[in-house]
Amino acid sequence: MEKIRTAVIGCGKVGHFHAYAYQHCENSQLVACLGRNMEKTEAFAAQYGIRAYTDLEKMVRETGVQAVSICTPHPDHGNIAVRCCELGLHIAVEKPLAASLEDCDAMIAAANEAGVTGTTICQRRFYRPAMRVKKAIDDGKLDKPILGTVNMLGWRDMAYYHSDPWRGTWKGEGGGVLINQAPHQLDLLLWYMGDIAELYGVWDTLNHPELEVDDTAAAIIRFKSGAIGNIVVSNSQNPALFGNVRVHGSNGASVGVQTDGGAMFIAGVSGIAEPPVNDLWTVHGEEDMLERYKAEDRAFFNSIDSIHYFHIRQLEDFLSAIIGKRKPLITFEDGRKTVELITGIYRSCRDDMPVKFPLAPENRGGFDGRLK
């Protein structure tokens, strides 16, 4: 089997997920990692038996790396990705794709110019219940989707925000719950419902007075299809409750996936304690399938390394796309759509009015909450 020479950029908590995944992808040979601090980077490299670098060009020259994962704080994604494209590297970027639409557009343009493959990490698309929802929609089992909802009601204490200096700031993170915890659910909503025509959104910091970013947000969406959407996300429920995405059809049928349970997953801190399952299934003639699907998904979850399995699946798809010269399941353009949705909510709240998509030029600047 052809193997792609891979490397990880960013040697923090999420970088370990990618390094482990690359070492367990059949089509990967992990060769290096890149960080800012050589001592920390060497310690990271020692865990995987790879070479440590602080200079990107030197790493490429000496290792012949072909594909990299970018696992740095969100505002750094754009500049790093553009330089990687210029060096001819294929790129997987941790969610969100970037902290601004400008960075997303620069990344997409650079990848197209260089002819390299890009993906953004949305590993929850590989959940079996999430794929089951998508297939039901594509197979017409809901007739026409007319309503899509996201509820992501989690908890992050201040110890979490203090664990890394970039967390909970506009400069270091580019936002709060919307841009850090909610992108997975927002990606699924867009995957299921399609492009947005217009939205009205609000956000606030309601339960973390030390933060300058959002810990709670909501939005009402009109999709281009004419369907309506609703988003409610928060990091203020203690204990955490759940995250789910649901789609309701014009024939009365409804399907849903619970992506997160009450034991919230924090990368590098906690494991995934509860399996993703279909939490709603009223497809006509299939109403009795819900409990069967739940049982199947729980059994599958208990049979895998749930912390790493879905990163492995997405990175295998990414590398297979490179080898097969095809698009990956999740593209940079998909990642941009999620960032545009998040940006639209921030802009709508700032201006206290609905915003139309695609966002107008004056609405595409990097957002700073102090402008509110």
Range-by-range predicted roles:
Residues 18, 48-110, 310:
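Beta-loop-alpha module in the N-terminal Rossmann-like domain of NAD(P)-dependent dehydrogenases
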Residues 106-124, 143-148:
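Rossmann-fold dehydrogenase core element
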